[in-house]
Amino acid sequence: MSKLSHSEVLIMIQGGLVVSCQPVDDGPMDQPAIVAAMAQAAIVGGAVGVRIEGVQNLKATRPMVTAPIIAIVKRDLPESAVRITPFLADIDQLAAAGADIIAVDGTDRERPVAVVAALERIHAQGCLAMADCSTLAEGLYCQQLGFDIIGSTMSGYTGGELPVEPDYQLVKDLKSAGCYVMAEGRYNSPALAKSAMQMGADCVTVGSALTRLEHMVSWFAVAVQSAKE
């Protein structure tokens, strides 16, 4: 359960950058102490909040960060493509570990627990609820259910070819519909993040470009190698 009121959390992240501190799975940076250090560095650098995956990572980060934390659990399930916080037990554990906001998959795909049940459990635990959506219809449905934040997180990640650019249109449409919008997904440069805010996002989350060192190094390595061709 968050120690901050819901209105305080939303005001604190409004107009700012949230940093997703999710290292490459099983990579050398994938350690709770390192995740906590990433979160601290992100706040020092100007982030208004962080997004943390995993209960152990959250437990390591919460004592080090007073800024709002968006928390998730990712699971690979044999019976569902839904990965983000699929079970009610995940919500309970994240709340107990100090999450301010708990995000769940808000797509219309088959899942072990209904979206509305997840929403009710998040609110019962005293946390804000965020829906990671892929389309306008999903976002509007989750808004109508009562989710506090609608994220464009899943746009481009539910099948088909992965787009290169962020989904600015989804951000714009969600905001026009009255949602509190978290722009997320492929915002890999300051210019792209700025554009999200100009499209109406309330805040923007950036991950790989800031906290996945392997990805960043590979971008530079490929560019350097291409100069030899």
UniProtKB/Swiss-Prot annotation:
Question: SUPFAM superfamilies annotated for this entry?
Answer: Ribulose-phoshate binding barrel (SSF51366)
> Which class of enzymes does this protein belong to?
isomerase
What EC number(s) are associated with this protein in UniProt?
5.1.3.9
Q: Which InterPro entries match?
A: Aldolase_TIM (IPR013785), NanE (IPR007260), RibuloseP-bd_barrel (IPR011060)
Q: Which Pfam families match?
A: NanE (PF04131)
Question: Could you confirm whether the keyword Isomerase appears in this record?
Answer: yes
Q: Which residues form a coiled coil?
A: none
The record's keywords, sorted A to Z, are: Carbohydrate metabolism, Isomerase
For this protein, the record's CDD domains field holds: NanE (cd04729)
A single Gene Ontology molecular function, please? N-acylglucosamine-6-phosphate 2-epimerase activity
| Catalysed transformations (reactions) | an N-acyl-D-glucosamine 6-phosphate = an N-acyl-D-mannosamine 6-phosphate
- The protein's annotated pathway: Amino-sugar metabolism; N-acetylneuraminate degradation; D-fructose 6-phosphate from N-acetylneuraminate: step 3/5
The alphabetized list of GO BP terms reads: carbohydrate metabolic process; N-acetylmannosamine catabolic process; N-acetylneuraminate catabolic process
Q: Which GO terms describe its cellular component?
A: cytosol
Q: Does the keyword Nucleotide-binding apply?
A: no
The cross-references to PANTHER family, in alphabetical order and at most eight, read:
N-ACETYLMANNOSAMINE-6-PHOSPHATE 2-EPIMERASE-RELATED
- What family is this protein classified in? Belongs to the NanE family.
Role summary: Converts N-acetylmannosamine-6-phosphate (ManNAc-6-P) to N-acetylglucosamine-6-phosphate (GlcNAc-6-P).
| Name of the protein in its database record | Putative N-acetylmannosamine-6-phosphate 2-epimerase
The record lists the organism as Haemophilus ducreyi (strain 35000HP / ATCC 700724)
Gene encoding the protein:
nanE
